[in-house]
Amino acid sequence: MVLITRYLPSVTDNNQPALEGQSKDQIVDTVITSTTVGIINQLTMLVAHSNSIFTALANDANLVTQRIEKLGSRIRPLIQSIPSIEDYHRNTSIDTMNSKPRAEFHADNSERNQHFTHASIPASINTVYEKCKPPPNLQLLDPYMDDGQKSLKLYTNPDFFMDEWVAEQQKLHEEARQRKRERREARLKKKGEKNEVEVKKVKSVTKVRYDPVTGEKITINIESPHTSSPQIQHQSNNTATPQHTTQHFGTNQYQAPPPPPLSQSSPSQQHSPINSYTPPPPPLNTSTPSPSSSFQGRPPSTGFNTPPPPMSNNNNMPPPPPMQQNGGAANNRLSVHNSAPIVAAPAPPPPPPPPSAPAPPPPPMAKAGGGASDIKPKASGARSDLLSSIMQGMALKPAEERKVAEAPKKEEALNVADILARRIAWAGDSDSSEDESDDSDWD
């Protein structure tokens, strides 16, 4: 259907003269008069249409002029503030400008509504609407309708488009809610599968270390972070000396006394009968120590080695005599002779110390409430034991080679870069060998 915006009626639309019962001259005069009236009517309609057109143009021009004036009023203060803004940006660093608080700009966009109203209906549409026939009288059927609906609504519904728009918006809203519900269910399902499948287990970590003094292998097993302390397992190596065993199992037998003071005497006094003092034997209730274990706890600088005295409940035991420093071959033989363990009856108490040297302090005794197992022996270095054993001329047991498990070598993937690097290395080796052969020929 074509909507005519501006309609110009024909000359004969509004002028239908009655020509019946008139003569020829009267008919001609009547037609000329009606035609002139029709032309004048058309000119009138043209003037009305032109007036409406130019009025609309004037209104539009007026609106544009108002917008331009409003925009000009907003631009004038900006033009005045441009020089000051340029000076500020020229004299201020970017960091200073970024550190200051800034305001967010929001454009004031007013929303317009009520675009389609009765007042905004064009005249051509009103003309067509006025020409339409009125609806039939269907109110008589309303008592027979269900749910109290109007029967005229089935014939014509002015709210049809509004109802359709509301139904479409509700449908879109339901679809959006359904998609959101599906995404949430898929996310929860994926999270549940992840919790069921991916169960991370804590791997036990094993740390292997070696004691720098004794060469003992120490294995630390760390099973989980919840344990209070890691389990430490000591695995003795073949290179450990026998004195380490004595040091662990002989702590509850006796305790080594502090080193005796060394008196500096003349060479004539070094070979006196007092220096040939034989130390008392170890206690009988202890196990017989090995020859190598009797040299522990002695510094390498002393020429005469004294075994530790036995622990006794008698507090009146005299302290051991002081030893003198000597360096002869006879003293070395004497120390070798005295180093052998003696298992015999208890010997008489030792003679008093010589008057030339002060008496050493008495050895520490065990407390009344504690036993001998609470006292720990003095730690001795493996180097001093080895040096003293060499000085005594004892046969040392050859240490076995300590084997450490090597990690399996992983096969490296060959690529083009590795092959080229190997070729360059081989080429360099061949060139150097050729240069050496040439030099040997010239020689």
Swiss-Prot record:
One Gene Ontology term, aspect cellular component = filopodium tip
Q: Does the keyword Coiled coil apply?
A: yes
Locate the compositionally biased regions of type Low complexity.
263-277, 285-305
Q: Where is this chain compositionally biased, Pro residues type?
A: 306-323, 346-365
Q: Which GO biological-process labels does this protein carry?
A: actin cytoskeleton organization; actin filament organization; ameboidal-type cell migration; bleb assembly; cell-substrate adhesion; chemotaxis to cAMP; cortical actin cytoskeleton organization; exocytosis
A GO molecular-function annotation: molecular adaptor activity
The WH2 domain extends over 382-399
Coiled-coil annotated residue ranges, if any: 166-201
First-listed, main subcellular location of the protein, grouped into a coarse class: cytoplasm
How does the annotation summarize its subunit structure? Part of a Scar/WAVE complex containing brk1, scrA, abiA, pirA and napA. Interacts with brk1 and abiA.
Q: What is this protein called?
A: Protein SCAR
What species is given as this protein's source? Dictyostelium discoideum
* Gene name for this UniProt entry: scrA
